[in-house]
């Protein structure tokens, strides 16, 4: 298979870039146990559902709305009447947020080296170029819950030296705010179309953990607008889904290949 091939040209056993991203997102929930997996974005939703179907069966997943599903369902499919195992109204969802029983994988319009994120405005606060979603749940999510990020298109415009507004709290700000902000604060991983990152340096700065197949470290650095820690040795290649994992992605969770619209090969 050519990495840039269409769905019909794919090898049965070789993963596309989008499928690698799904697998990398799934790994964010490894070891979480019985916790709500809240995901935003095609590949992150697929990742949460893949994790539940494979190595993390205790995860709680939803239909994208207020229903907890008895099992992971295909992307875009409603939970069948007999496939819902619970109702999760907004007040109960907020209880989970406030009590750390939710691992959310959010998106970010901007992210800096310490994991501060912006989903509110682009440009100066008093005269922004663009108005975005607003901070919404980002402050509470990052203070109260484990948080990861899924960014489909990494570039220096997204990976920035300083965010235009802080919506989600990073490690430097959590430390500065003290125990009330840092007690439950934890940024697990960042997954992009180029690689996987964590915040494993002594000062909680972003570190390159792996590059996706076919991507070089230099490409990742060129797509990053701040100094990125890469370690002293060779950067590993992100694990590809294989065998049953590929079958679940292609035949069970995303038979319409919606993942390929989010991440081009």
Q: How would you name each of these model-derived features?
A:
Residues 1-9:
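N-terminal amphipathic/basic-hydrophobic helices that include classical n-h-c signal peptides
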Residues 23-26, 218-221, 246-250:
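Generic detector of well-ordered alpha-helical segments enriched in charged/polar residues
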Residues 30-32, 100, 244:
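Short, charged helix-to-loop "capping" segments that act as catalytic/coupling loops
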């Amino acid at each position: 298979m050519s990495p840039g091939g269409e769905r019909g040209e794919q090898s049965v056993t070789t993963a596309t870039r989008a499928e690698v991203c799904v697998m990398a997102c799934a790994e964010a929930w490894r070891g979480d146990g019985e916790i709500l997996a809240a995901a935003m974005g095609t590949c992150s939703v697929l990742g949460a559902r893949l994790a539940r179907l494979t190595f993390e069966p205790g995860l709680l997943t939803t239909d994208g709305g207020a229903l907890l599903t008895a099992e992971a369902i295909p992307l875009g499919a409603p939970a069948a009447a007999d496939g819902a195992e619970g109702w999760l109204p907004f007040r109960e969802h907020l209880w989970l947020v406030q009590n750390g029983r939710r691992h959310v994988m959010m998106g970010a319009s901007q992210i800096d080296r310490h994991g501060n994120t912006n989903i509110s405005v682009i440009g100066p606060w008093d005269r922004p170029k663009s108005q975005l979603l607003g901070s919404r749940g980002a402050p509470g999510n990052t203070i109260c819950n484990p948080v990861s990020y899924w960014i489909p298109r990494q570039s220096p415009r997204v990976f920035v030296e300083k965010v235009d507004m802080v919506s989600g709290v990073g490690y430097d700000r959590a430390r500065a705010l003290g125990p009330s902000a840092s007690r439950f604060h934890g940024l697990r991983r960042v997954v992009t179309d180029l690689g996987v990152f964590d915040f494993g340096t002594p000062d909680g700065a972003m570190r390159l953990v792996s590059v996706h197949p076919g991507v070089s470290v230099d490409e990742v650095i060129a797509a990053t607008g701040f100094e990125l820690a890469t370690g002293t040795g060779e950067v590993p290649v992100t694990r590809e889904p294989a065998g049953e994992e590929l079958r679940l992605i292609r035949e069970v969770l995303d038979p319409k290949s919606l993942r390929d619209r989010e991440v081009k090969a």
